[in-house]
Every structure is written in C-alpha cells, then in structure tokens.
Amino acid sequence: MWRTMGEAYKVQQLNGYPQPALEAVYKCTLGSARALSLDDRIGSFLPGREADFIVVDYAATSVQKLRMEYLRSRDKWTIENKLFGLQTLGDDRNTVCIYIMGKQVYGSDSCDHQEASM
C-alpha cells in the first residue's frame, strides 16, 4: 500500500496536484469503501465494523529514523508528516502487526501499539 501511495504522490506532483498524505490514506481506506458502497461495513474503526488493519513502525529503517529525528528536532512531529514518510519511504519493514477481522494474524504477541522508540 505504501509504495502505491508513493507512486500516486509522484504522479500527482508531476501533474501539479500534490496530494496530502492524509488524503492518500483516506482514499486507501474509507474513500475506497465508499466508492464500493461498503462504507457501512469497512473503512473505519467505528464499533461494529469489520476491522482489517496494520500497526506500523514509522522508523523501521535507518533513513526513516533519521527523518523522524529531524522532524522531532524541529517540532514537526505530526500525523501528516509521519504518514508522508510512510507514503514516500514505507515498505513491508514498517509493518509490526497485522489484524484481520480484529484478530492478530502477524506480529509479536506483545503488539501493544507503542510508538517506535528512537
């Protein structure tokens, strides 16, 4: 998903329409569910919805760690900047845990949604 979002970002940049990372995540989640008329069942974390999701480490690689340290040092540690980093630099190494239908199917037994330590 991250690579697809990154490629979409590049194409939109070339066309003069920069897509914010939050918009890209929306399009991959609730936006897609709405387009398929499935938003009453999937695409969000509302109670009663089917829940397939991942837990991510924003700083899984050395380049990502440097980027996160840079953002923190300049007080730019926002969800938009974290997601932009995943959108442009993310890959499978950022996936800590995977949940399908609310049940953990991948990752350590202690996947407790902690932020990556730096």
PLM feature segments, named:
Residues M1-L71:
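His/Asp/Glu-enriched, well-ordered alpha-helical/loop segment
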